[in-house]
Amino acid sequence: MKKTAKTDTEDAFKFRSTFGEHYYDGYGARHETPHIVAYTGEVTAAGPGRVLISSPLGSCIAVCAYDPGTRVGGLAHVMLPGVPPAHAETGKDRYAAHALETLFSVMQNEGADPGNLLICLIGGANVLRREHDTIHIDNLRSLTSLILQRNLPICRTMTGGSERMMARMETKTGRIFQTTGNNPEEMLFDYFTHNIENPDN
């Protein structure tokens, strides 16, 4: 079993396993591949044969990173932009900057090359439809800036709107899927072929 990074850490990572025996995709099909769920403010990474899934995303954004050379994938469920407060002792991975540091570290622990990562972003919706609520925009701007500072490519995004989303990554195939609202799951990106199933989205 691989390890999943828990967010309420101090300096050292604490790990927990959240593997299930199966999961159901957006079409109701049953899959036997063990999966790991990243809840709000959590970061996870795993090698080939695992499926990484975000819990539902509102203004939060799922950072889906993948190293095609090692088939190691990682997912960070980011809640807030920027860096955590200086006095914060727990929940640091809720913040974009700290979550990315954790994501790249745990992926490297699984064998990934931090310089070889490809990124997709999913989420960042204004689900409450508040006119002056900008947290979803701030999250996207913060993550985009931090990722580009590392010279890592953002291959595909599915962000904005007002409906909740979910992200799912297959580490074996290098495919990432997204679900918006109650719609069926759709493939967003293939990390190996760079194919996009829905290029007009």
UniProtKB/Swiss-Prot annotation:
User: Which Gene Ontology biological process is one annotated for this entry?
Assistant: chemotaxis
Spans through the membrane: none
Q: Answer yes or no on keyword rRNA processing.
A: no
Q: Domain of life here?
A: Bacteria
Keyword Hydrolase present in the record's keywords: the answer is yes
Which InterPro entries is this protein grouped with? Answer: CheD-like_sf, Chemorcpt_Glu_NH3ase_CheD, Cytotoxic_necrot_fac-like_cat
Record's catalysed reaction(s): L-glutaminyl-[protein] + H2O = L-glutamyl-[protein] + NH4(+)
Q: Which UniProt keywords apply?
A: Chemotaxis, Hydrolase
Q: What is its EC number?
A: 3.5.1.44
A single Gene Ontology MF term assigned here is: protein-glutamine glutaminase activity
Q: Give the function comment from the record.
A: Probably deamidates glutamine residues to glutamate on methyl-accepting chemotaxis receptors (MCPs), playing an important role in chemotaxis.
Q: In which family does this protein belong, per the annotation?
A: Belongs to the CheD family.
HAMAP family (UniProt xref): CheD
Q: What is this protein called?
A: Probable chemoreceptor glutamine deamidase CheD
Protein's organism: Chlorobium luteolum (strain DSM 273 / BCRC 81028 / 2530)
